[in-house]
A protein has these predicted regions:
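ATP-dependent small-molecule kinase phosphotransfer cores
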Residues: 39-113, 119, 124, 142-146, ...
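Walker A/P-loop
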Residues: 20
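Hydrophobic anchor at the beta1->P-loop junction of P-loop NTPases
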Residues: 9-11
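ATP-binding Walker
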Residues: 14-17
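Conserved phosphate-donor/acceptor-positioning beta-strand/loop module used by diverse small-molecule
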Residues: 128-151, 162-166
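Post-Walker A helix-loop "phosphate-sensing" segment adjacent to the P-loop in P-loop NTPases
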Residues: 27-37, 50-53
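NTP-dependent small-molecule kinase module
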Residues: 2-4, 77, 101, 146-154, ...
């Protein structure tokens, strides 16, 4: 395994495509800070669902100034209610700005980091600092739905999970601000055809080629 003094990795992909697991594994392998942008939007959704503020933007702006990423990452943010809500929230330009600013502060302070989300290579790490390598994750809808269904401990029907994932990906791809896209130089990882070990191995082969 090659050692790096600086390494910035962008991991983008569809819902339940395995990007979070892959980002976690690769971060551990290369001793990188892991930043999951999806958790930030889920945290925002949880706050809005729970508090129902009159002015959501000011409310979230205040909350994100006080919270740490560690605190957010330790919360349970994967309920189906949050999953259904977060796609709508992620379309809001002002909310995206709040989340993006939070991410950029963390990225600025870390030379070795893996950032995972939906607009990382195309927006967050598109320039200064730009990613050293980008990955894009895809997964067959049936496989992705089953994996998410297991993750949420079968609390809703498999069919409902499938509908939710299909809707979320469609919304991510067609939203006006920072839509989900694969940048030209991103390496495609089709996770339904690979196990965790194979995904990690494939990523490592590409990372170790970086000069």
């Amino acid at each position: 395994m090659k050692k790096f003094k600086k390494l910035i990795i962008a991991c983008d992909g569809e819902s339940a495509s395995g990007k979070s697991t892959a980002a976690r594994l690769i971060s551990k392998k290369y001793r990188l800070i892991l930043l999951n942008s999806g958790l930030l939007y889920r945290y925002a959704s949880k706050l809005l669902i729970k508090n129902k503020p009159r002015d959501p933007i000011s409310f979230l702006n205040s909350k994100f100034k006080k919270v740490t990423y560690r605190n957010i990452s330790n919360q349970n943010l994967h309920s189906q209610q949050i999953s259904d809500h977060v796609a709508l929230l992620a379309k809001n330009k002002e909310i995206r700005k709040i989340v993006n600013n939070f991410q950029k502060k963390i990225i600025k302070d870390n030379k070795k980091i893996c950032v995972e989300g939906r607009d990382i290579a195309s927006k967050i790490l598109a320039k200064k600092p730009k990613y050293d390598i980008a990955f894009y994750f895809k997964c067959n809808l049936d496989v992705a739905s089953y994996r998410r269904w297991i993750d949420i401990k079968k609390k809703v029907s498999l069919n409902d999970v499938k509908k939710s994932l299909r809707k979320r990906t469609a919304m991510d791809r067609t939203r006006k601000f920072s839509p989900l896209i694969k940048v030209k130089d991103a390496i495609l990882i089709q996770t339904d055809k690979l196990n965790k070990k194979q995904v990690l191995s494939k990523m490592c082969k590409h990372i170790d080629k970086i000069n």
